[in-house]
Regions:
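Glycine-rich FAD pyrophosphate-binding loop
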Residues: 8-32
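Mobile amphipathic helical/loop "lid" adjacent to a hydrophobic cofactor/ligand pocket
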Residues: 48-52, 56-57, 61-165, 169
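Conserved flavin/dinucleotide-binding core of flavoenzymes
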Residues: 307-423
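A short coil-to-beta-strand element that immediately follows conserved catalytic motifs
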Residues: 65-66, 213, 278-281, 354-365
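Glycine-rich active-site loop/strand segments that organize a redox cofactor
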Residues: 28-46, 114-118
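A short, Lys/Arg-enriched amphipathic alpha-helix followed by its capping loop at the start of a domain
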Residues: 3-12, 207
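Helical element adjacent to the flavin cofactor pocket in flavoenzyme catalytic cores
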Residues: 170-233, 246
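Mid-domain catalytic core of redox enzymes
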Residues: 215-338, 347-352, 379-382
Length: 423
């Protein structure tokens, strides 16, 4: 949808094909027990300038649509970092030096690490794992467990022993070393479908475009100077072939590989995409009685199944609703959903003293939520051997891991490439 909006703004007529009945992909709203949920907790950072600009472009209001929190990282009863109101990067350095839960020597070590990264311009001569990088700069087990590990898992959704240090440094550079507001955390007050895809759909339609849901593209067929798309028949339409001047494939990696594999010029890219591994994200929703609330809107746990808790009452007015997030691979994947919800409930009881039982629970397991952002990962370019077929997605070549900002940048890049050729 980022590509579609960008093209629509350039007065290019676009048609969006969405195989699902609902727009949004992995950032979408879902209904459960008459309560509106997200399929995952998607945090935006202040440095996500392209995403925030795009939301405003289609009619969003950032201050109304998000709860904005200054940089903070709290692991309950174990570690707390809150950045003071200072210009960057002094807000982070002061926050590290004043953080609670670490000795002063370790706090100083963390601050020196950030200064060292700034001196090398957040650039490594060659990629290594995040764990290797942290060890290289004398960050010990406690610093890794309480500070850098949670940041890495949250940002890259990849365990630190295999996560790309260079991509990790890109995230630190843009979020912690720019403007102070770049490190702000923005928690959506409304579900993601309402936040962007629905508004983007109206924007595209107002600019003489079309958005077709429940309409799956089954084949990409080069035809002369154009590209034919073959769509699957549905309950309300027959199979259909339509010719376009350009095509942006913004589907999941699995679907993109399937579509590209049948086109000889794109077969190599299909194999490259198919070689990308994925990581899961589990969200455990627990609906407690309305009076139940967390000490703060976002709270972390140390050495628990639940890594982060979000109080949807404080964030979105959904009182008593707690979302527990478990990022990346782990033993939780071996548990049945009911048992996982039971264990998270027990952790909340033990850690926070919340004795009330949840009225209901819902576990949403996105088993292929993101690409695994590993060291030296060969990510495909947005350009392909067919000049009028482009590839968009957060897994394509770029500075960022699997984030909304990475996806938006990729889509906008494809759109601008096409807009230039049509001038």
């Amino acid at each position: 949808m980022a590509a579609a909006v960008t093209l629509a703004a350039a007065n290019v007529s676009v048609t969006v094909f969405e195989s699902a009945k609902q727009l949004g992909g992995r950032a979408r709203g879902v209904q459960n027990n008459d309560v509106q949920l997200d399929n995952g907790q998607h945090i935006l950072l202040g440095c996500y300038h392209h995403t925030l600009q795009l939301i405003e472009q289609v009619g969003g209001n950032i201050e109304h649509d998000f709860l904005r929190l200054p940089l903070q990282l709290t692991l309950h009863n174990r570690f707390e970092l809150k950045a003071p109101h200072l210009p960057a990067p002094f807000h982070l350095l002061a926050g590290l030096l004043r953080s609670k839960g670490l000795s002063f020597g370790k706090r100083l070590r963390a601050a020196r690490f950030m200064l060292a990264l700034s001196r090398i311009n957040f650039t490594l001569p060659h990629d290594i794992s995040v764990f290797e990088l942290l060890r290289m700069y004398d960050q010990d087990d406690e610093l890794i467990r309480l500070l850098w590990g949670p940041i890495c898992i949250s940002a890259l959704n990849t365990p630190i022993h295999i996560a790309s240090a260079q991509v990790f440094l890109h995230v630190l550079r843009d979020s912690l070393n720019g403007l102070r507001s770049d490190s702000d955390m923005l928690l959506p007050r409304i579900d993601f479908t309402a936040l962007f895809p629905e508004r983007a759909t109206e924007y595209v339609k107002q600019h003489k475009g079309a958005v077709l849901t429940a309409c799956s593209v089954e084949a990409i067929i080069p035809h002369g100077e154009g590209i034919k798309l073959f769509t699957r028949p549905t309950a309300v339409s027959t199979a259909h072939t339509e010719l376009f001047s350009h095509v942006i494939c913004a589907s999941s990696p699995i679907s993109a590989a399937r579509l590209f594999r049948t086109v000889p010029q794109l077969a190599f890219i299909a194999e490259q995409i198919a070689g990308i591994s994925h990581q899961p994200i589990y969200t455990v929703y627990l609906q407690y009685p309305e009076q139940v609330r967390l000490p703060q809107p976002m709270l972390g746990f140390d050495r628990c199944f639940a890594q982060w808790l979000f109080d949807k009452g404080q964030i979105a007015g959904q009182r008593g609703l707690i979302a527990a997030v478990i990022s990346a691979q782990g033993s939780h994947q071996n548990l049945k959903h009911d048992l996982l919800a039971q264990k998270v409930t027990q952790e909340i009881c033990e850690q926070l003293g919340i004795m009330e039982a949840p009225l209901w629970h819902k576990v949403i397991a996105e088993k292929r939520a993101t690409f695994s952002c590993e060291t030296n990962l060969p990510r495909p370019s947005h350009a392909t051997p067919l000049a009028n077929v482009l590839l968009a997605g957060d897994y394509t070549a770029g500075d960022y891991p699997a984030t909304l900002e990475g996806a938006v940048i990729s889509g906008m890049l494809c759109a601008k490439t096409i807009a230039v050729t049509l001038q």
